[in-house]
Amino acid sequence: MPKRTDIKSVMVIGSGPIVIGQAAEFDYSGTQACRVLREEGIRVILVNSNPATIMTDPEMADATYIEPISTPILEQIIAKERPDALLPTLGGQTALNAAMALGEAGVLKKYNVELIGASLDAIDRGEDRELFKKVVEEAGAESARSDIAHSLEEVDKIAEKFGYPLVVRPSFTMGGLGSGIAHDEDELHRIAGAGIHYSPTDHVLIEESIEGWKEYELELMRDKKDNVLVVCPIQNVDPVGVHTGDSITVAPVFTLTDREYQKLRDIGIAIIRGVGVDTGGCNIQFAVNPDTGRIIVIEMNPRVSRSSALASKATGFPIAKIATKLALGYTLDEIQNDITQSTPASFEPTIDYVVTKVPRFAFEKFPGADPTLTTSMKSVGEAMALAGNFQESLGKAMRSIDKRHMGFNWDGDKPSEDEVSQLLDAIKVPTEHRYLQIQRALWGGATEEQIFAATKIDPWFIRQFALINETALEVKNAEKLTRKLLKKAKLAGLSDLQIAHLRRLGDEGENTIRELRWSYDLRPVFKTVDTCAAEFDAATPYYYSCYADETELRPRDREAVIILGSGPNRIGQGIEFDYTCVHAVQELGKNYDTIMVNCNPETVSTDYDMSDRLYFEPLTFEDVLEIYEAEKKMGPIKGVIVQLGGQTPLSLAARLKAAGVPILGTTPESIDLAENRELFGEVLKKADMNAPRYGTALSLDEAREAAHAIGYPVLVRPSYVLGGRGMEIVYDDAQLRKYVDRALKEAQADTVVSGRLPSPLLIDKFLQDAVEIDVDALFDGEELYIGGIMEHVEEAGVHSGDAACTLPPSTLSDDQIRRLREGTYAIAKGCGVQGLINVQYAFMANTLYVIEANPRASRTVPFASKATGVALAKAAARIMVGETIQQQRDNGLLLPHGDGGDIHRGQQVAVKESVLPFKRFRTPLGKTVDVLLGPEMRSTGEVMGFDRDFPHAFAKSQLAAYEGGLPTSGNVFISVNDTDKRQLPLFAARLVELGFNIWATEGTASVLRRYGIDSKIVDKISVRMDSDPDDPITTYHAEGSVGKNVVQLIEEGAIDLILNTPNSRGSRSDGYAIRSAAIAADLPQFTTMTEFSAVLMAIEAVRNNDYQIMSIQDHSTQLFELESRD
């Protein structure tokens, strides 16, 4: 059945911003879809609100719209572009829900747009819990006993029928949002209430708990001829009760008999047929009772999912690409397997290695959050590793997480009997540390039976953990490390660093072990991912390392460049850095063999055909050096690029150079010049530039001395971090002591000597009421090219990754822009930058201060590139291999004249807004953690608003970030601190003019009354500064009030918009309860006056709904015309 010829144009909907449960995997799948569609000669119209994606690059589609994924905006684009079909199955839950909304609104019918990949009926049957339950029954399979509830009253009736514990599952949400396991009525009301709220269909499934059962997933595909194949079975190491995104997962499955697996396969095939997915893929989750073998179908996703990306990378089978071809009418037997280039896609993949995925968490960013892992996903990223056996694969995956203390360790004495008892209690509750606690408990003498009783993790896996411990004990106690023992340790997944710790070899121990290993000629070999267990030759070089006998690397002729990726997504280092790596691969591939090293299965950079060679390996010194040494034997290497993947590869630069690896672009010495506070101070002094007064400290006494010399408030942070990790605004000595005590505790015990830290704390004067600016630039040693000047909407103090920003800047004068340009040139020249640099500045009372400089790609590079139409990372890659900025102007990569710092009359305005994951993180009693922003980054993703002026662009950014966007009428609650009350009357008067009603606490209402502005008084709430987030709220009744506090009004749906500026001393004040309630209700809320000023302009601008919709291709053309004109 050949491709359909009636489809000439297709709209693809992306997944929007990176959020927990929906991350970079949809950029990967969407990019594959766009490439397939264009190869087939189909016009592609792409809509996505996330600028930090490869799929929104202009060459990926014929018309690319970086716009909010809302029904009115999508309808405008459909009306303009008139696509023949809509493909919604590659953009996660966002795209699926958007397609359903377009169908229900009659938009698809109105414009005669066909849904391909999955029908509305199939989406409904797969996503709606009640309909799916019927499909399962018709397939002859079993669901957990369950019932549907639309209200808490119905929830209570079901609880009476089934008893506790109960599982709550909402329909049409991703990452288990709104789901959970309830053990009593309070938990049930909290979880089910959130589930009903977050489900677009306002109902939840309440089902019997099957906690402790084994969990499996099947990834299936089906075509029009009813050919069905299972791409990959995946096993969760955690039993049912932990969301699959938060569990360690493995492929192939280890704990099913062949008969059980065939039964799962038969059920899966019956369900994909019953749901009606006939031109694409789906993911089905199963639970198996370990005692009886009873099989329960948990749920399905009738689309490409997070597990699809994992299965694709695990097997080499490109699910998204094939799903797109199936949607166009091809059948599986007509599609070629790209990896073998000799077998059809109808051959089920077979693997002869073990794949392990380990999640990465960020609980440290959300103090007070409940660390318990449940059915609602909480991890922010993941790493994957491949190896010859499970132990080796697990060891590689755990070190790929790139987080201190995340690998097994055997430091110090064995745990005592009391400690083992405590560990056995701790592992009953799943947390991110559970596997380390299991390993420590086994190390201390706990039996495998005790571990199983506490965790219900399958005994096969527990046995593997015990075997790793046994090997570690051998290594620790051996008189001599023989070649045989060293190889056994490597097969057990132990790194050189872990072995060095076991042998107590000190700081140089890792190098000592490597030299010993090399003296034995004990090195990893590299095997190929080929989809067919080596039955056919692989044409694509996709490699993993293992300690086996024969390497499968092939010689090459061209000079190679190795690019180090960014590893697992995390807060502070996300998809933006994968974007810059992919651009470097695309550009350098024209002249060099590109070799990509990364361990993140979600990303475009780890697609099998993106680079000339892909190594799915941990980004550690040991693993990267082994790749370099192996590739050196295969052909010439120009060098390694470390400045595009964020802090992870950057931290390897100095050691790699010391080991003889050539580093391209900015040298490790120059990196240190910018990162080291004292050395950077000298650069600024020579350039006659201001920095906030600062000091450094290695102890509490030094910190106190520095803070007193500078004057409170101060900004305190560790050296060499990304995403503002550990950064805090400190107002007095008591707060400073707490900060230093915590830093000493978090530092590795063996590096702390008598209260002194291993690396200095940086202490800066905090600039209050300053305007913060980010500048991204290119430098080739002589010429500077400004990529973009981005003005923050919030004042200084909010981390640049969380702040909204605008490009071009909206309030800077020509003179201020000139000073920024001159300052950036002086810093880039002084630091010896060769490639990208990001400098953060602040203007306070028209004095320019340099906050920091980063001689690498920054997270704003994709945004600046999309806003200016210039691929900065591509130009940077060419500069790193020795080309000049003038050469990039000549070849068209950069503007022929001027740069991104120039402002042109009539230029479109771009606004970047951050997206925060607060609804995922709750305290143990269910309240959301505080949303107050500060110097430590907490956002997971970003959106971009693009329009003719700042108010319209800002309004679009809010529409993309908040479901429904900004209200244009209704009730506004206002509560501001004393400092902000001076600005309040102007804001309040404008709100009244716009038709809003103002609700305020008594103090704020009193200020407004003096200016003749009416407001309704609400009762004041009080939370002690030192209270626990879960402490009850005290209400103080005010005279003339409406008789309710604001939290009650938010919960009743009476409030539409919130302005709540906090007191300076932190989040445990009254505002916390307000902000928490607003997050639970999905209300737009703003915590700074500067941002609320922008909100007012935006509301005024969009009252007529007159957004300008323009593709970025048209925008780039307009920009080049304006540049030529000016």
UniProtKB/Swiss-Prot annotation:
Comment block on domains: The large subunit is composed of 2 ATP-grasp domains that are involved in binding the 2 ATP molecules needed for carbamoyl phosphate synthesis. The N-terminal ATP-grasp domain (referred to as the carboxyphosphate synthetic component) catalyzes the ATP-dependent phosphorylation of hydrogencarbonate to carboxyphosphate and the subsequent nucleophilic attack by ammonia to form a carbamate intermediate.
Domain annotation ATP-grasp: ranges: 133-328, 681-881
Protein's recorded name: Carbamoyl phosphate synthase large chain
Needed co-factor(s): Mg(2+); Mn(2+)
Family indicated by similarity: Belongs to the CarB family.
UniProt EC number: 6.3.4.16, 6.3.5.5
Self-association state and partner proteins as the record states: Composed of two chains; the small (or glutamine) chain promotes the hydrolysis of glutamine to ammonia, which is used by the large (or ammonia) chain to synthesize carbamoyl phosphate. Tetramer of heterodimers (alpha,beta)4.
Chain spans, region Allosteric domain: 963-1126
Domain MGS-like: 964-1126
Taxonomic lineage from the root: Bacteria, Bacillati, Actinomycetota, Actinomycetes, Bifidobacteriales
Region of interest (Carbamoyl phosphate synthetic domain), residue spans: 552-962
Sites where the protein binds Mn(2+) 2: 299, 301
Domain of life: Bacteria
Pathway assigned to this chain's UniProt record: Amino-acid biosynthesis; L-arginine biosynthesis; carbamoyl phosphate from bicarbonate: step 1/1; Pyrimidine metabolism; UMP biosynthesis via de novo pathway; (S)-dihydroorotate from bicarbonate: step 1/3
Family annotation (CDD domains): MGS_CPS_II
Catalytic activity of the protein: hydrogencarbonate + L-glutamine + 2 ATP + H2O = carbamoyl phosphate + L-glutamate + 2 ADP + phosphate + 2 H(+)
Annotated spans, Oligomerization domain: 403-551
Cross-referenced Gene3D superfamilies: 3.40.50.20, ATP-grasp fold, A domain (3.30.1490.20), ATP-grasp fold, B domain (3.30.470.20), Carbamoyl-phosphate synthetase, large subunit oligomerisation domain (1.10.1030.10), Methylglyoxal synthase-like domain (3.40.50.1380)
Gene from which this protein is expressed: carB
PROSITE patterns named among the record's database cross-references: ATP_GRASP, CPSASE_1, CPSASE_2, MGS
Function: Large subunit of the glutamine-dependent carbamoyl phosphate synthetase (CPSase). CPSase catalyzes the formation of carbamoyl phosphate from the ammonia moiety of glutamine, carbonate, and phosphate donated by ATP, constituting the first step of 2 biosynthetic pathways, one leading to arginine and/or urea and the other to pyrimidine nucleotides.
Alphabetized Pfam families for the sequence: CPSase_L_D2, CPSase_L_D3, MGS
Matching NCBIfam families: CPSaseII_lrg, PRK05294.1, PRK12815.1
Cofactor note: Binds 4 Mg(2+) or Mn(2+) ions per subunit.
